Curated annotation (Swiss-Prot):
Component of the Mediator complex, a coactivator involved in the regulated transcription of nearly all RNA polymerase II-dependent genes. Mediator functions as a bridge to convey information from gene-specific regulatory proteins to the basal RNA polymerase II transcription machinery. Mediator is recruited to promoters by direct interactions with regulatory proteins and serves as a scaffold for the assembly of a functional preinitiation complex with RNA polymerase II and the general transcription factors. PANTHER family: MEDIATOR OF RNA POLYMERASE II TRANSCRIPTION SUBUNIT 19. One of its GO terms (cellular component) is nucleus. The lineage of its organism: Eukaryota, Fungi, Dikarya, Ascomycota, Taphrinomycotina. It comes from Schizosaccharomyces pombe (strain 972 / ATCC 24843) (Fission yeast). This is Mediator of RNA polymerase II transcription subunit 19. Pfam families: Rox3. Keywords: Activator, Nucleus, Transcription, Transcription regulation. Transmembrane segments: none annotated. It is found in: Nucleus. GO terms for biological process: positive regulation of transcription initiation by RNA polymerase II; regulation of transcription by RNA polymerase II; transcription initiation at RNA polymerase II promoter. The keyword Lipid metabolism does not apply.
């Protein structure tokens, strides 16, 4: 029995790699070598330097707001939540979470891959009977 030949797809579209590449030295590429030496934790000889408390002197000439303020809002919300009683109307909950037969307002059959000729829309009918997607326009 003869084997079927193997076919391989050969693409005809050439893709250009993005620039800059992650394989490049980005610090050197963008001219940040001197800054990296100044603020680096380890000097060129491998000795550890004292950690600087602030980089503010290096970024003051950049536009924008350069000072980060401590914000403990989320921490306060988590540690001391405001607990207040909220009245719950049980009848309202039953109304909003109830499911009734009929067409869903704003339903788009194309989202679920249903055929375009499925009858959906505002047609007067008995709302107690759900509309079947198999009913077609004539």
């Amino acid at each position: 029995m003869a084997q079927a030949p193997e076919y391989h797809y050969v693409g005809s579209v050439d893709y250009q790699p993005t620039r800059p590449s992650a394989h490049q030295n980005l610090i050197e590429l963008y001219g940040l070598t001197e800054l990296a030496k100044k603020v680096g934790r380890v000097d060129e000889f491998g000795n550890k330097r004292k950690m600087r408390r602030s980089y503010k002197a290096y970024i003051q000439d950049l536009p924008g707001y350069n000072e980060i303020l401590r914000d403990n809002t989320i921490k306060q919300w988590l540690t001391n939540p405001i607990r207040e009683e909220v009245p719950i109307d049980i009848e309202f909950l039953h109304h909003v979470f109830s499911v009734e037969p009929g067409i869903i307002p704003g339903f788009n059959p194309k989202v679920f891959g249903l055929e375009d000729d499925v009858v959906m829309g505002n047609v007067s009918r008995d709302s107690s009977q759900p509309r079947s997607p198999s009913r077609r326009k004539k």
